[in-house]
Amino acid sequence: MRWTFAVGTVLVAALGFSAAAQDWYHDRDERFRDEHWRAHVFEHVRTDLDHIGSAWRAADRERRRLERTREELGDLQAKMEQGRYDGGELNDVIDSLTKSSNDERLSPRDRDVLHDDTNRLMDYREHHDHWAR
């Protein structure tokens, strides 16, 4: 009886986590539906890094790189809000996200999210002078 209860509890928890993950991916799609995200592009990419569920499978070195990238995204968002552009730091972030999006230990869906984020940042790099703030 206890074993059945324990298994049932684990299954319910797993379904709950799966539903929450699905909601996050749906919410992410909604966030990027129109152009309002542009003023907060670095903040949104950082949120994506915070929610990547498969990062725990990555190597310590990869997790440290992702943490450093989160910090750089915060810096870039602050600079953007001040009207400043830092191409060097942006290139570092793009390189880091590119490496992460190619890491086989991350789930394919999480790699797709990182690849999409990389494309958004490359678009910003190319058009930052005309980017909506």
Question: Where do the PLM segments sit?
Answer:
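Classical secretory targeting signals
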Residues: 1-22
